[in-house]
Amino acid sequence: MFNSYQATGMGYNPNQQQQQPPPPQQQQQLYSQPTAFGQPNLYGSNMQQGYIQTQPTGFAGAPTVIENNELKIPSIRLSFITAEDQKKFEHLFRSAVPRGEQSMSGDTASNILLRSGLTPVVLAEIWTLSDIDKTGALLFPEFALSLHLCNMAKRGEPLPGVLPQKWHNEVQSFIDAINFSIPDDPNKILANTPFAKKDDWLSNVGQPQSNWMAPQGTGYPQTSFLQNQATGFAQQPTGFGQQATGFGQQATGFGQQSSWLAPQATGFNNSAPPPSTSFGGTGTGIVAGAGAGASAAPTGGFVPLQPQQTAGLIQKPAGLQPQSTGFMAPQRTGGLAPQATGLAPQATGLQAQRTGGFGVPQQATGYQQSFNTGGLQANKTGPLQPNHTGYNFQQQQQQQQQATGLQRQPTGVLQQQPTGYLQQQPTGYLQSQPTGRPGEWGFVSMPTGGMPGLNSMQQVFQPNNTQTYQDLHKVMNDNSASNVTWAISKQEKQIYDRLFQAWDTGRNGYVDSNVALNVFTKSGLGRQDLEAIWTLADTDDVGKLNKNQFAVAMHLIYRRLNGLEIPLRLPPELIPPADKTLKDTMDSLKNSLKNGGAKQTRSKPMTKPDGSRFKNDDSDFGYVSSSRYKKKSEEEKQANARTSKDFGLSIDDMKKLIREKKILIDAMDVEDEDRQRTSDREVDALKSKIYELQKKLSGSSNNGGNSKEALLAKLERTGKRIPSLLQQLNQVNQEISEKSVELVKLQLKREDPSWDEAKVDVSGAGGKFDLKQKMAMLTGKGGSAMADSKYRDAVEKSKSDLKNQSDMVKDIESGIRSLEDDCSAKLRTTAKNAVGYEKWENGFGVSKAVADFVKELNKLKADAQPEFARSADNTTTARSSSAYAQQVPPAASRTFSAQETNASPGAVTSTGTGGSGSGSGSATYSTPEERAAYIKAEAAKRMASRLEKLGISRTKRAPKAAEKHDEIVSKPSPSREEPPRLSGEAAIANPVERAPSADKTPVNTAHAESHAQTTSSNRAPEAKPEQVSVPVESQRENFRENKWDEEKQYRPSQTNNNDNNNISSTHQSQEHIVKENAKNVESAPQAPTSNYSQQPPAFGGAFQSESSRATETEQAESKKESETTPVVPPAPAAASTEPAQPAQPAQASQASKPAQPAQPANSTEPASASASEQPAVRRHENNPFFKNKFQPVDTQKISMQRNFQRGTSNDNSWSDSEEEDSEDEAPNRAGAAQLANLLFGSMSSQPTGNAAFAKSAAQEPSKDEKSIGAENASGHESKMNAELSSSENTAAGVSQVNETPAQSSYEEPSLQEQSSYESNAVPAAPSLPESVPPPAPAPEAPSLPQSVPPPPPIPSEYSAPPAPSLPRDVPPAPEAPSLPQSIPPPPPVPSEYSAPPAPPAPPAPSLPQSIPPPPPVPSEYSAPPAPPAPPAPPAPPAPSLPSSIPPPPPAPPLSSNDSSLASAAAPPAGGAPNIGALLGQITGGKSLKKVETKVSSGATVGRVL
């Protein structure tokens, strides 16, 4: 329709001249044409008023599409989109983006994309690929990419999963260019360019052009254009004066036509048909024939695009609107037809161009004839006016001819003219269109209209040319700028190459920067433009240009001279082929490097058959010539003909085949033999290497997998024991917490009997108060607020301690678990390793030869690792023996000790050395005893490490523990006559070791030194043999040392008179010496007893039995020291502190039982009776507590003891040095405090004061008596255990209440009196055995302990020797568990560990010393002292008197002598065991009554008050 319609406008004139149908038919024709061709009909009636009205209506919708001209889109080509598509996309983008915006919103883009008819899923995928910056809006390159992808999808091509790298790079660079090219001021853009003064050189062209250019910039005012037309029409009529007469109607039609021109201009406000026609005229002035063709051709197709380029940015929208409507073509054709007629005289030139297109040559002749009449005159009038004149004249002719016979002419002419016209018009347009295609660098043909100024450029840029750039500007017309393409045309390339050769005088193949600068400045462009052009051309950035780069630069200059912009990036069309190839290669290399060299294979669309399906199979062999096939086939035929299966073979053929087969078989045999020999050599070489490696491994490695399995099994066994041990440890901590609260409770009751813990609200400070408490608080009298607060504090402290301990246990558990996990991870073998081990270590699942070789390797391993295996066995044996030793019952341990003692002196010495060594002597044990000692040492080490984890340091008592260890080993050898020497030595060692504790208070060093000298002579040999049992004793000693140090910190310092200080110092030195002697005596038997208590080898049990007892005994001893020697470590303060509280009860019991001098005697009786009843046991032979109890007694010392108990004492009786001498002698003669066995049997307390006298008296008995005493003691041991535990607990609790009175009464005697007491006490020893009741008292112990406990402590001082015997016996073990639960336990602990006995002894001397400093100690217990005196008389009501001094015992202590005796005896009470024996004495001892009478008559109590 469009083409035929255009043709109608062109074809009217010639035929109308020949055929002139009548006008009525013309009218019919005009109406009939519209029916077939709507637009042509309008054109035909363009002179009528109706057409003028309909033309605007047809274009009413077109102007609504307004482009956003403010968008600054860089002129960059996207290589994957054609130039035509990119123009369309840009137009669509400009129309959719509102003014002021640079990007298209998501909603707008979705509306546009939905028009494509694709599914939302596909569009969503396209959006994901297009929205590169993920901003939700699309810039132009992204929008173009999205439309391109839509086109792909519409064509059925699959969308790429990932945007191709090349596309992505181009789009991204386009986006960057947009972001960086924010529009600048136009004045800045034009600055330094030859276009800055356009008006100057445009004014030279002529007024019509300048007048037309002015309206073009402002928006094409129609008035100026119509005026020019009018002036042109004014001359036309003059030129056609003759015709005017003949065409009267034409004039009228002309007038109508002129009126039609005005509305035509109105309809084309935004379009520019008049400028196109005017330029057509201009074209005629340039070239005769070509110009007309150039003007006509472009206007017929996309005419609006030409004015768009020539006129600048303002013309672009005008050109695009008619392009989309398609309605302008008919109007333009009508306008162009007269142009052609107006140029009819030049038709010959046009015919040459249109030869292919015009099939009717008469058409041109008709034009010539018609225009010869007067059309040439109009052409001469002016370039613009004659065009319009011819146009109008043509219209007049058309109108006239239409009136005559238009009906047939259109049909015939329409068929011919459109073809010729349309063919030529697209030809010119299509030639320029390919220029936009990428990659056609240097191969683009010259556009039809030609490129303006090329020849001038060649002349201006020649080296010796004198022309200037102004000449170039004159030639460069904007009219033909639309023909300037992006790509370089062939003609351009030839011109630029000639220029390059002219400037490259040296034939170097390049032009350097200086020469290029001279060439480029000839263009007259500004510096800024030339810099941009150089940057784009010099792609290698080397400062010089080769031929292709020079051509690119010249082309950019040419474009800029034509008014086109310089691109920000070099478009694909201008990239030289060599550079493009290099860039593509580099991009592919970069991409391959990014992907790690892996070749990306994209899934191609299967719309077409893929070439891969026709490729050869790789499994096929390469090319094989036909000759080979022939040979192979012939050989196969021959072979087939000669096979043995063929029946037609002759005998010769068969023989031949046999020979051939034999030859082949022999050859195969030879090859097999060679291979076998080679493989054998390789196997032998490998075997030799394996042998060498195995030898190296055997010499340096361990058991490997076997050791791992053994260690893993051991780890699992150990891990199973950990939970039970931790549970026991938690139980011990719980018990300790409970016992500490009980201890505080008993202490508070002793201080205030009316205090009731049930009334104390432990939950918070604001507890409930009853009426009495409130009244007491109001009146300030009485009340138990202090006691309540102490109790609450004790409960809180116990809870916090328990929490801390439990936290430490948890930390230990977590540490153990982590260690276990780490070890198991390293030791565990995977299934794969296990399989490999069975296969290659044991030879399972392999061939016989390999299995034999594996066996040989195993033999080699066994031969190479005998020493290691033995050492491993030894270590495992030693570990198992140590583990066994931990579980050995006390009987076994005692047997070991007995055997050890019976061993020869050499054996003993070796044992000592072995024990002292750190496990090094494990292989040198000659007896079970030595190994048992080693096991104990190992246990001690483990205990020390565990205690360190709990935060308890054991370094302080380490040397002491070693010495005690030596003592324990040496004491068990009573068969030799060395006991006196051993005990003496031990006595020397202990005083020195106890020096630190003695330092706590001022000590009379003279006494200590003298005592050390006297004891050293007797006990020298004792130290070394006792080293074996160091561990357990050292642990307990460490516990006590730590506790004493803590108590020292808690005790407030008290100041006293100088006399008091001296007395306390002397007493303390004596106390420490006595303590050391008692400890030495007890140390040997205690180690076995501890083992007995440790029957379960669990760590928790051991810790419970050792740590709890040690702490309590330390507390008891320290309290005794503090209370008896108030000067430096005042006892009152110690009593208030919790750690020291457990010791106070024992001290109180000792001090509150002054009337118990007879108790020692009584205690010996039950021991002897039990000994006679039960046969001697061999395991107790070496135990000093079980030796013969019937030994000669030193009557002098016994009498001294009696005097001391009765209160008749000399001034010097209290000297500790004498007591310690007697103590030293006792163990020497009795071996191990035999007198203690006589006095107290199996009791576990260790009163050091009496122990000293008893030991001194017992030193004289013969060896036979020692053995008898040991046997009797062993028999009595079991019976006394129960009594001890019950009596000690109860007695200790009661003794605390009565502690102060006894102390106050005993403290008064002077040092001289004390010494006299000591001398008198010696004779008292014989009486002690007599009064001791047998086991009978044991049952009574529970009931009497509350009141009786005080008496036992007193005798314990003087009966100290017997006390040690009890602790050494089995009883100590049972006591350990009981100790933690109640306060009394502390005393038993000392009994177990020789350490406790020592502390009790010192307290005795300290008590008298404390008299001078009564304020400190008595301050707390000052009130109680008075009561003790009265209760003493009521001996029978012992239970009722617990709060005060026990009935019978208290009386004697009240007297000065008795008090001194009591004070001396009190120290021994530190060990609970004496309490049990004393309880028995209390029930039926007459001596107690005597003591009571003495107590009642004593004045000590009065003094204390």
Swiss-Prot record:
One of its GO terms (molecular function) is calcium ion binding. It is a peripheral membrane protein. Keywords: Actin-binding, Cell membrane, Coiled coil, Cytoplasm, Cytoskeleton, Endocytosis, Endosome, Membrane, Repeat. It is found in: Cell membrane; Endosome membrane; Cytoplasm, Cytoskeleton, Actin patch. Residues 1331-1453 have a biased composition (Pro residues). It comes from the Eukaryota. Gene3D superfamilies: EF-hand. Residues 1216-1225 have a biased composition (Acidic residues). Residues 118-153, 525-560 form the EF-hand domain. One of its GO terms (cellular component) is plasma membrane. InterPro entries: DUF1720, EF-hand-dom_pair, EF_hand_dom, EH_dom, WH2_dom. Disulfide bonds: none annotated. PROSITE patterns: EF_HAND_2, EH, WH2. Residues 677-752 form a coiled coil. Residues 1-30, 364-416, 422-441, 588-620, 867-927, 948-1505 are annotated as: Disordered. The keyword Transferase does not apply. Component of the PAN1 actin cytoskeleton-regulatory complex required for the internalization of endosomes during actin-coupled endocytosis. The complex links the site of endocytosis to the cell membrane-associated actin cytoskeleton. Mediates uptake of external molecules and vacuolar degradation of plasma membrane proteins. Plays a role in the proper organization of the cell membrane-associated actin cytoskeleton and promotes its destabilization. Component of the PAN1 actin cytoskeleton-regulatory complex. Belongs to the PAN1 family. This is Actin cytoskeleton-regulatory complex protein PAN1.
